[in-house]
């Protein structure tokens, strides 16, 4: 038994997952420390505003991915393996289209954000904080693009090294702001959303200067964007990203400026932190799924993926079992309600990790993102409609039940679609 475990750990996939997981959890530690620090400086209502604005920034950065993540993981690993001459053309094209579309959306947001905040988000944040939030979106988009490219090239160590060095510098900056009493919503968003990504890119540029120059010189070729595949996954991923934030946005709508938004925002951040472990695993598994050719390979990758994804499933369960005093220790009793909210959310997310297996298969093996679009649309509608009716009655404890139901319904769709597509795969290599 011990020998099998050691052999499992020694596999290249396991090593990459260990590297990526350690890196992601260093990032998690920084995020936890930021929360640990900020809840001691900011009032719950102020932290609630920060949670909403950062949530908007993160959601928009994911929206403005435009499905390029799927293209990068589907095609870049094969291009690198075969030393394809279009590697830099591919990277330049993806970056150019993504940036161009992002600038259009960000410009519209700059114009309408104050109005949207007034009628929907109701944070009452000053205009300059809204504008800093808007500009931070583009920097997050560029950082995500670079991280995806590094991961697709299996440069997991470097991606995590640069990200966590930028986290270290952000920590120093925030601590430096404390004596000047300059820690507020605006300065935190500026530090997280603009300075952090800038540091990341500077570190990457110094080490990969030759690649930067080749990408700059490469032409933009429209066919490399793969619009049909990319656009479908883009729409699908946006429904899911919005679903994960819709609970907080609707809480902000119904419970404007209430401390409960701060409690829930902190709980959501804890859950999203655990979800980082899922990303660290799927980022490594994705290239493997893109190379599947037979049913035996499907079974093999599902088996491997299932073992790895039991880790975040176990983390959600451990989070549910965590004593309340642990939450009080890290976040103070000022945020005491966070403990119960986090436990409720952890149960809701318990089945989510394993749902990534059929998702990876459909996206990278079958290359049929339309099924993911259907699943994510159901998840989004369930969360949006469910939270709209449960929040006025149950407050912050309404969304966890709705999220659990949404994952179940979305999972059923993914499972049925996977079985349907599996039947099309040849049993053995031809």
Question: Where is each model-derived feature located?
Answer:
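Interhelical loop/hinge segments that connect adjacent transmembrane helices in multipass membrane
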Residues: 1-13, 185-190, 201-244, 291-297, ...
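Signature of the first transmembrane helix
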Residues: 12-69, 106, 110, 136, ...
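Interfacial segments at transmembrane-helix termini and the short loops linking adjacent helices
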Residues: 14, 113-133, 258, 321-351
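Membrane-water interface segments that mark the loop-to-transmembrane alpha-helix transition
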Residues: 16-27, 53, 65-114, 295-316, ...
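Interfacial/gating helices of multi-pass transporter permease domains
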Residues: 38-59, 126-127, 222-229, 233, ...
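Hydrophobic alpha-helical transmembrane segments
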Residues: 52, 127, 131, 160-211, ...
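Helix-loop junctions and terminal segments of transmembrane helices
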Residues: 65-81, 152, 248, 271-295, ...
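Membrane-interface junctions at transmembrane-helix termini in multi-pass inner-membrane proteins
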Residues: 139-162, 290, 349-375
């Amino acid at each position: 038994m011990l020998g099998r475990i050691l052999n499992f750990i020694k596999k290249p996939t396991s090593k990459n997952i260990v590297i990526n997981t350690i890196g992601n959890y260093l990032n998690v530690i920084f995020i936890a420390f930021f929360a640990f620090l900020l809840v001691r400086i900011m009032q719950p209502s102020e932290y609630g505003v920060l949670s909403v604005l950062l949530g908007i920034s993160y959601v928009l950065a994911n929206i403005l991915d435009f499905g390029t993540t799927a293209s990068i993981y589907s095609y870049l690993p094969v291009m690198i393996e075969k030393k394809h001459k279009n590697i830099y053309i591919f990277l330049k094209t993806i970056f150019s289209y993504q940036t161009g579309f992002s600038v259009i959306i960000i410009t519209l947001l700059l114009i309408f954000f104050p109005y949207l905040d007034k009628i929907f988000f109701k944070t009452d944040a000053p205009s300059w904080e809204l504008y800093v939030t808007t500009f931070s979106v583009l920097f997050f988009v560029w950082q995500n693009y670079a991280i995806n490219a590094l991961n697709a090239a299996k440069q997991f160590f470097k991606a995590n090294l640069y990200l966590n060095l930028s986290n270290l510098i952000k920590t120093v900056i925030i601590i430096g702001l404390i004596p000047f009493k300059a820690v507020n919503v605006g300065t935190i968003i500026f530090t997280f959303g603009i300075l952090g990504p800038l540091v990341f890119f500077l570190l990457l540029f110094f080490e990969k200067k030759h690649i930067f120059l080749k990408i700059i010189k490469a032409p933009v070729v429209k066919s490399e964007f793969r619009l049909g595949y990319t656009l479908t996954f883009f729409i699908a991923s946006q429904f899911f990203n919005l679903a994960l934030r819709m609970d907080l946005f609707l809480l902000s709508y119904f419970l404007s400026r209430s401390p409960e938004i701060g409690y829930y925002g902190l709980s959501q951040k804890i859950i999203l932190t655990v979800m980082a472990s899922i990303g660290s695993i799927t980022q490594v598994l994705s290239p493997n799924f893109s190379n599947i050719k037979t049913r035996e390979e499907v079974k093999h990758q599902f088996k491997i993926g299932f073992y790895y994804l039991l880790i975040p499933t176990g983390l959600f369960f451990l989070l549910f079992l965590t004593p309340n005093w642990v939450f009080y220790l890290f976040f103070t009793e000022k945020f005491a309600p966070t403990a119960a909210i986090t436990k409720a959310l952890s149960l809701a997310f318990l089945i989510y990790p394993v749902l990534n297996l059929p998702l990876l298969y459909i996206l990278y093996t079958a290359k049929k993102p339309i099924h993911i679009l259907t699943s994510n649309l159901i998840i989004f509608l369930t969360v949006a409609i469910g939270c709209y009716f449960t929040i006025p009655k149950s407050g912050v404890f309404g969304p966890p039940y709705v999220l659990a139901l949404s994952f179940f319904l979305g999972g059923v769709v993914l499972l049925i679609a996977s079985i349907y597509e599996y039947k099309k795969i040849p049993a053995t290599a031809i």
